[in-house]
């Protein structure tokens, strides 16, 4: 399936960039603010399984990419992966929302901005799922062209929208999150590094 292979590789590369958003929910350093530590634990405990879900979805797409799979198989894998990512980002947004504002200056705005951003990312992945579901798997050229468009959208998605998350996790919030075991394991790579 030579026509779709380069596009699949672009798709996989763009997905890897998107996963960085979730895995960035870990900071570095320490702090003694009990309320903030409690908030960080609540969020990190919810983020960990979602980060694993996103990592698994990325791995599935990358595996399908390296297999030279048939268009129908690529479509099925991508569709499920996009749905999983949509669900995961929505769950992370819900976790940040339910945790309330972190106990820092401007915490409420940071929290609200992050929730909006996570919901937007979730919706974007749901839209990508709809797009991939509509692709014509019987016509390899049309399928490759459709995948190329999806890869372009995915690339834009992976490059945009991380400002609110970065803003949420900066300073004391990032320090508190860095101390949480669940955030440490959520940011670990599959190789254990």
What kind of region is each of these model predictions?
Residues 2-16:
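Bacterial N-terminal signal peptides that target proteins for export
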Residues 30-84, 185-192:
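Immediate post-signal-peptide N-terminus of mature secreted/exported proteins
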Residues 33-51, 141-193:
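Extracellularly exposed regions in secreted/surface proteins, prominently low-complexity, repeat-rich
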Residues 23-27:
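C-terminal motif of bacterial Sec signal peptides marking the signal peptidase cleavage site
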């Amino acid at each position: 399936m030579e026509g779709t292979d380069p596009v699949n590789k672009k798709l996989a590369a763009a997905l890897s960039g998107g996963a960085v958003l979730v895995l960035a929910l870990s900071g570095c350093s320490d702090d003694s603010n009990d309320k903030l530590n409690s908030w960080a634990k609540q969020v990190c405990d919810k983020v960990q399984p979602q980060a694993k879900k996103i990592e698994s979805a990325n791995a599935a797409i990358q595996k399908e990419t390296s297999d030279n799979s048939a268009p129908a198989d690529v479509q099925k894998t991508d569709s499920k992966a996009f749905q999983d990512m949509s669900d995961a980002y929505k769950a992370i947004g819900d976790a940040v929302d339910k945790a309330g504002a972190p106990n820092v200056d401007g915490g409420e705005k940071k929290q609200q901005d992050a929730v909006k951003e996570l919901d937007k990312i979730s919706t974007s992945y749901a839209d990508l799922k709809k797009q991939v579901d509509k692709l014509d798997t019987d016509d390899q050229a049309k399928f490759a062209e459709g995948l190329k468009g999806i890869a372009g959208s995915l690339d834009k998605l992976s490059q945009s929208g991380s400002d609110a998350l970065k803003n949420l996790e900066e300073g004391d919030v990032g320090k508190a999150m860095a101390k949480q075991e669940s955030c440490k394991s959520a940011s670990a790579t599959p190789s254990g590094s």
